[in-house]
Regions:
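Sec-exported extracytoplasmic/periplasmic mature domains
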Residues: 76, 80, 98, 111, ...
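Short, well-ordered beta-strand elements
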Residues: 39-52, 91, 101-104, 123-126, ...
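Short, low-complexity disordered leader/linker segments with a strong preference
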Residues: 1-42, 56
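Surface-exposed binding/hinge segments that line
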Residues: 105, 124, 135-202
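Aromatic- and charge-enriched surface segment that lines or borders ligand/interaction sites
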Residues: 91-139, 174
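N-terminal lobe/hinge region of extracytoplasmic solute-binding protein
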Residues: 46-97, 221
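Extracytoplasmic/secreted proteins, especially bacterial periplasmic and envelope-associated proteins
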Residues: 66-70, 80, 84, 88, ...
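Gly/Pro-rich hinge or "lid" segments in bacterial periplasmic/extracellular proteins
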Residues: 170, 180-251
């Protein structure tokens, strides 16, 4: 199981940096990794090449993953030591006896960076987007264990209501798999399954489109421990602490510069 977890995280980027980001949220960084600017704790990370984008459902690169890890959070998150799935946006979940139905409880305190409350519908919308044949997301297969997800993604099924995802109520997200999948929770640690903000996606007509302006700093809405502050192409991307993050009290850094 641990080998699979490592492979899943490596698919989404650099494992070591993912750990560094996780630890930076709950601990002070080591000297040399951070700099103080006006009394603020800023972590500086050399991030390699310029980003394709920071849309979690369309990108595939390591540099993108590093930034997305700071800006978004999925239903579950990897434990920094064991790599096992632990609660993220979902505070808890149950699994049916036949191992095919997962029921996630979305935190009442979970919010988007603009203050909007998160709900189960955010995940229904976001998973519909990544499975959209028109979007053509490279990592759509991460959700293929879900009932009828592959058929919808490949265009052989047109009715998304037949896909095994459902908002049972505002804070209850139910997922039905086509067969028992022991590693399903591990798949949910991949950034492609992270939620995107429905109103923002719709405002910029990004449901089936790539490269729209929703990921610009003035438009961006995420749900992670940090929010997008500045993006100077080919120079630097800066994120700052998201005070609307449900667990912001453990975020020791004021920002990260990539």
């Amino acid at each position: 199981m641990k080998k699979f977890l490592k492979k899943t995280l490596q698919l989404s980027g650099n494992l070591g940096l993912a750990f560094a980001l996780l630890f930076s949220l709950s601990n002070c960084t080591k000297s040399g990794n951070s700099a103080s600017a006006n009394g603020k704790k800023i972590l500086r990370i050399g991030n390699g090449s310029e980003l394709q984008d920071i849309d979690p459902q369309t990108v595939t690169g390591v540099p993108e993953h590093n930034v997305i890890s700071a800006l978004f959070e999925g239903l579950v998150a990897p434990h920094p030591e064991t790599l096992e799935p632990q609660p993220g946006v979902a505070e808890s979940w149950t699994i049916s006896k036949d191992q095919k139905i997962y029921t996630f409880k979305i935190r009442e305190t979970a919010k988007w960076s603009n203050g909007d409350k998160m709900s189960a519908d955010d995940f229904v919308f976001s998973w519909k987007r990544i499975l959209s044949p028109k979007l053509g997301a490279e990592y759509s297969y991460m959700l293929f264990p879900v009932k009828n997800a592959e058929e919808y993604s490949k265009g052989t099924l047109k009715d998304f209501s037949q896909v095994g995802v459902k908002a049972k109520d505002a804070q209850t997200f139910e997922v039905t798999l086509k067969a028992p999948t022991p590693y399903f929770l591990a798949l949910l640690m991949h950034y492609s399954t992270f939620p995107v903000h429905k109103a923002t996606i719709e405002k910029f007509n990004a449901m089936d489109s790539r490269g729209t302006k929703w990921t610009r700093p003035e438009n961006f809405v995420g749900n992670g421990p940090f929010k997008l502050a500045k993006w100077d192409l080919n120079k630097v991307l800066t994120v700052e602490k998201n005070t609307n993050y449900w667990n912001n009290q453990i975020t020791k850094l004021d920002g990260i510069s990539f």
